[in-house]
Amino acid sequence: MNLLLGHNQFIGISHISEKRSREREKKFSDVKNIYKIVEKAADLGFEGMIIETHPRMLRFLDYYKKNQTFDIEFYLQVPYVQGYIQKMNEKGLYGLISEIIFRAGLKTASALAIKNLINLICKDYLSMVKSALYLEVKPFKDIKIKTILLHNVITDLALSLQMKEIFIEYIQYVETKMKLKPGFITLNFDLFKNCFKKWNIESPTIMTPINLKGYDMNP
């Protein structure tokens, strides 16, 4: 069994206590503190870590690449849903896409190119998924990505709408174009399992909550 280190605490998330959330936010605003925890976890036998394209995690990875006193594999969760929603509210779709492109290192993208991309997104949501996925993963090309995990917001929405093609396209794109292992995060494991069996899709890597209290589990 592989031990994986979660990342929520490093971006100030606690599902139990707002006070704890504030404490974590303050402590881990300095990425050196994240590095120390991950370094200790690797020393204790943790072989992998969940990350996402949160700005703080990107800063941590920059620090990791410069120092790298330990070796660990990363499981990349995409997309950064909270950040997408915030950018959409602040700057609209144009601002959101501009931010993704800039973060991917394509700083010279023209307004016309962005407008064309928006038009494409409106016409073809599968192209949107692939384009966003490519741009989300691009900043991580220099580190060991074990698996690309599709965020549960996207996974569970696609499951509820029975959008089989989303899963097939995602798996094929990650495997053939990105040469990485695809995976999914879901809070609806039973529905996920039944849908993949019905669609005859081979079970990939799955991350889902399993606990005695049924927290974040459906049903």
Give the location of each predicted region.
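Hydrophobic alpha-helical segments and helix pairs
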Residues: 94-156
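Acidic (Asp/Glu)-rich catalytic clusters
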Residues: 43, 61-71, 137-144, 196-200
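N-terminal binding-site loop/beta-alpha segment at the start of enzyme catalytic domains
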Residues: 1-69
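Acidic-and-aromatic substrate-binding clefts and catalytic sites of carbohydrate-active enzymes
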Residues: 48-60, 81-84, 156-158, 190-192, ...
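Short, acidic/polar
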Residues: 25-42, 128-140, 189-194
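Hydrophobic faces of well-ordered beta-strands that scaffold small-molecule active sites
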Residues: 1-7, 49-51, 72-77, 148-150, ...
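Active-site mouth loops of central-metabolism enzymes
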Residues: 16-33, 113-132, 160
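Beta/alpha (TIM)-barrel catalytic core signal, keyed to glycine-rich beta->alpha loops juxtaposed to Asp/Glu
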Residues: 142, 146, 153-219
